Amino acid sequence: MQLSSLAAALGLPARADLAGVEITGVTHNSSWVEPGALFVALRGANTDGHTYLPQALQRGAVAVMGEGLPDGVACPVPYLTVPHGREALADAAAELAGHPSRGMGVVGVTGTDGKTTTAWMTRHLLRAVGVPTGFLSTVGYELPDGELRQFPAHFTTPEAPQVQQFLAELRAAGAQAVVLE
């Protein structure tokens, strides 16, 4: 996807330096950057993702997105300034994945106790009435045909790019609904 198209989809103003830049993926983790990636520098309680900008660029990031470059930090690739980095990460991931949840029924289960039971029961009920349903939990995901897949070991809770990737896989496997724990 062209960076200019992604920026437009995110509601960002058009800029000449975005033309011709091809984005092949998005991540907030500099060690997961692959050539062609958009690196999203998130600010956290203990660290600022901009600290990892050199590593992301070395690994092949072709653009960076964040809530603003810190003073004294240079960025030799296009930098997209957004008001909310984590929200922009989610929106960019959905856009790059083709918004896989559109057209699917999506059930989210949150809370302290009973999430897994509630999510599995919901999945079972949807399948019982003939709705091909995928399932996404904190340990893995299940395709509509019942095939279980575990997340790679480095995931504890999948972030937006991984969730969108899994949703795209579920949709490609025929899911008409998904239950997210």
Feature annotation, model-predicted:
Residues 1-91, 95:
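N-terminal leader/targeting and accessory segments in enzymes
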